[in-house]
Amino acid sequence: MIDINKWMKEYCDLMIKTFGSRIEIIGLQGSHGRGEAKEGSDIDVVLILDEVTIDDLEQYNQAISGMEFRDLICGFVSGIEELKSWDKADLFQFCYDTETILGSLDEIKSSIDRDDIRRAVHMGACNIYHGCIHNMVHDKSAEILSGLYKSARFVQQALYFYNTGVYIKKKKELEDTMQAYDRQILEVKEFNNFADKSKSLLEWSKKLIEEMRP
């Protein structure tokens, strides 16, 4: 299992050596950021520079090529102005899921208002609804369905924040806050009954689309 604190220190040292004062933010997202990582979980790192060019990306790729667990590294690389100009409905999850190690997301986070969060919920539910129908008719994939259920968790995080002003990162803690109808979506772990699981997710997303529409 990865010692993520040790690994992130090595990553930060390497980024400082590579980009120096151009670094605006370094952070960690995903299962490692939430303390829910398993063996083989991706390392979702965030690197925000003053700007990003093709040369920067080549430098970045070269810098991380020799790191341990290179095959697990993914995440988000961006220039700071692009991030500030990003759609705020999308920025909601980004900001609240990121554990910042260098720099701060506070300025960007403070620009996100209640309607941006509503749009995050609505757009997420719309994408799940479409993905569920497409998968039922065309792909018929349990793996895709599993991914859609994972997306539903992020929508539920946004919905809970919209209703309470509290962001809950960990799945188990989120499950404990949900009413039975929503909790059944979070608790699904097996996808052997494809039709029933698809039906449940489709009905859940349809209800949310209607509730959160402008």
Language-model segment annotations:
Residues M1-K17, S21, G33-E39, D50-P214:
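Catalytic core of pol beta-like nucleotidyltransferases
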Residues D44:
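N-terminal loops that bind phosphate or other acidic moieties
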Residues S21-Q29:
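Short, glycine- and small/hydrophobic-rich beta-strand elements in well-ordered beta-sheets
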